[in-house]
Amino acid sequence: MPSFISIQNIIYPSNELSLTMILLEEWSLTYVEGIDSKKYLQGQLTIDINLLLKTHHTLCAHCNFNGRVWSTMHLFHYEKGYAYIQRKSVSQIQIKEICKYSIFSKIKIRELNSICLIGFAGCNVRSFLSSLFVKIPNQSCPVIHEDNKTILWYEKPSERFLLVLPFLDFLTLKRKINQNIFLNNSKQWLLLDIEAGLPVIDKICSNKFTPQAINLHNLKAISFKKGCYYGQETIARIFFKKTNKYFLCFLVSTGSIFPKIGSFIETKVDSEWFKVGVLLSIVHVKCEEIYIQVVLRKSVNINNLFRIHGFENIFLIKN
């Protein structure tokens, strides 16, 4: 039986991406069930869960008492409760923290290790998925449930989809593919998230930033009208007093470097370099370019030259 799937080891920006299936091994799925799940999540997350339709998913954050982000996640209705997708490196500590106050609630929170997260993106991706599924999500209905499979629709940086399905169903899906498609790892999805302006919070950067510092207020991931939730006092104060001093952006350079996540970002003023930000994520693109997502001080000149502490490669802010 011929294989239509070709391994791809090069990461491409969205405007150059061929039809690609992406294994999201760096992300995880957490499931929340129980009669108190809605009420409990309402007191923990930054969005108003009462407004979340069953046909939609939403970006949000889980913060500590001081308004620092443990993790960012995409939340949606799933089976008998809710599920959210977050970075795998932070899932264990995030689940531990969100369970701390659940002893008196009828709720169960756990990571679903038996579920596969598979991305689809690139040229003609909608047409491709339409040959495999009866319904495909879109802007008006970004979440579709079909049997025991769920498909999420993402608009930016270009139309893409995330499939949530059991491993055996993934194997069945692979056997049904009858047209050429590339297979890549989660770095490809990471790049698409960076291009889309979605903050990437791994374990090393957990518990360091407020939601506003990573642009969640502009991504409609914070509700300022709901009742109390963890971190609300700090988050609301920053919003109403306009005291946020940071912003999320992505920078580009060339070369091949491997800095640690959490490294300092420096900018050049006159002849000296000063620390002005923190590295959240990095992807090597087409073997020659480097894309990084960073948190910078708002006071910085966006036309400046930047570098990662300990490396000489010069970065510029991507417009």
UniProtKB/Swiss-Prot annotation:
Q: Does the keyword Methyltransferase apply?
A: no
Residues reported in the UniProt entry to bind folate: 27, 189
Q: Which domain of life is it from?
A: Bacteria
A GO term for molecular function: folic acid binding
Q: Write one Pfam family the protein is assigned to.
A: YgfZ_barrel
Looking at the UniProt record for this protein, which Gene Ontology cellular component terms does it annotate, in alphabetical order? cytoplasm
Coiled-coil positions: none
Keyword list (alphabetical) reads: Cytoplasm, Folate-binding, tRNA processing
Q: Kindly list the places in or outside the cell where this protein is found, as annotated in its UniProt entry.
A: Cytoplasm
Q: Which GO terms describe its biological process?
A: iron-sulfur cluster assembly; RNA modification; tRNA processing
Report the InterPro entries cross-referenced here: GcvT/YgfZ_C, tRNA-modifying_YgfZ, YgfZ/GcvT, YgfZ/GcvT_CS, YgfZ_barrel
Q: What's the main place this protein lives?
A: cytoplasm
Describe its function: Folate-binding protein involved in regulating the level of ATP-DnaA and in the modification of some tRNAs. It is probably a key factor in regulatory networks that act via tRNA modification, such as initiation of chromosomal replication.
Family, as annotated: Belongs to the tRNA-modifying YgfZ family.
What's this protein's name? Answer: tRNA-modifying protein YgfZ
